Amino acid sequence: MFLLPLPAAGRVVVRRLAVRRFGSRSLSTADMTKGLVLGIYSKEKEDDVPQFTSAGENFDKLLAGKLRETLNISGPPLKAGKTRTFYGLHQDFPSVVLVGLGKKAAGIDEQENWHEGKENIRAAVAAGCRQIQDLELSSVEVDPCGDAQAAAEGAVLGLYEYDDLKQKKKMAVSAKLYGSGDQEAWQKGVLFASGQNLARQLMETPANEMTPTRFAEIIEKNLKSASSKTEVHIRPKSWIEEQAMGSFLSVAKGSDEPPVFLEIHYKGSPNANEPPLVFVGKGITFDSGGISIKASANMDLMRADMGGAATICSAIVSAAKLNLPINIIGLAPLCENMPSGKANKPGDVVRAKNGKTIQVDNTDAEGRLILADALCYAHTFNPKVILNAATLTGAMDVALGSGATGVFTNSSWLWNKLFEASIETGDRVWRMPLFEHYTRQVVDCQLADVNNIGKYRSAGACTAAAFLKEFVTHPKWAHLDIAGVMTNKDEVPYLRKGMTGRPTRTLIEFLLRFSQDNA
């Protein structure tokens, strides 16, 4: 990922939450093995009584009103996303966590560009499940809260934390739907969230563990276990050379770790000759910046510079699990960007697969170099759509932060499909410009056909997209710059601090809707 020189599903663990706890503590610790998360809505009017969800009402009736009675004396009404824990109310559930869902009527917010009700459910359920885990209970049953898919996503995303390499593990918590509600929607939510968690795990794993070869092997294992309608090709350096991918090879040559070109196929369409959608993901498994080396502070985060490859591959694995009736191909050029005597030097000129020459004025703008060859190769499949994802520019983080993925596309149809999918998932996208204004800044090049950085410091995300456009002739292409959404501090309440796996769920939703539209 090129950073502008500006003036900086596994086991689970949670932090202690500031919650109120009420009820009898007479049950022994040995009895406390299962928890329950129930939702309650905010008051619509000042004089209203906060309303339980349907599951909450039924549970309160089972207790002859004791849940409501205990809630009324426990403090002020619960705000959205807040939790309150009660003990000893029911023998099957020694701990019951009430979670605030906000207003029941919450729907699509046209300013926020998401479904507020679904986001409230995800955040509330995540907080409730973390509280159950914090109590060291091994299982939790979850109120569907009116949307079982959103509830499942909140539970599975909220409970995930990467601790694979720690000796001391926190207790894993299994979550399931409370009652006999919409199991199909719940399982769909589990699938969507598990797809994102796969991307999170790939992105979080240290670079000495997550090499290009290891990444490819993990995706191969996951894809083959997801469906029999799949093919995986782990292409070695010799194949990359045969394909004349000189731009990709120029980045890889600085590292002793061999490059891999991962090519995955999901053949879900009943028509084997149906043109596929092609997803392309940047797969830099560690980005030091090369000779244009990065500052050491936070360089460790560049283990996730393969986030584009992680998200597109995880989305395809999820599509295979959903058995979608479409054909999809995933392409991921995988390598490290390291400094050495063999590495690219500023001012070098390399040749891409389509014959265009590239002046490499900044070796830290390497993602676009490997994507250039992959995008050229993507055209050989006669695709319906080409979509690439990449943690491409620090400028994208400056522009949008973690609020949304930046989308550059030559197709309003494709933009609308991605935008609609993002409203559903809450993992938002925002359209960015592909003006000729930016193209001129990369094709005005002294030594080659195109420069890998723009003439000016401004609009770095836009000039990076303009560079990629030089290797695209397809009329339905989108470039997703995910640099700003790569990590989470506390912005997304149902994701812990760390790598996010965004926007995997939006890509899955896009594929699902595309398959339905083309049925």
Curated annotation (Swiss-Prot):
Active site: 294, 368
Matching Gene3D superfamilies: Leucine Aminopeptidase, subunit E, domain 1 (3.40.220.10), Zn peptidases (3.40.630.10)
Binding residues for Zn(2+) 3: 202-203, 205, 303
Subcellular locations according to the entry: Cytoplasm
Residues binding substrate, per UniProt: 282, 287, 292, 294, 305, 364
Residues modified as N6-acetyllysine: 221, 455, 489
Keyword Ion transport (UniProt): no
Molecular function, one GO term: metalloexopeptidase activity
Subunit details: Homohexamer.
Protein name as it appears in the record: Cytosol aminopeptidase
Organism in which the protein naturally occurs: Homo sapiens (Human)
Gene: LAP3
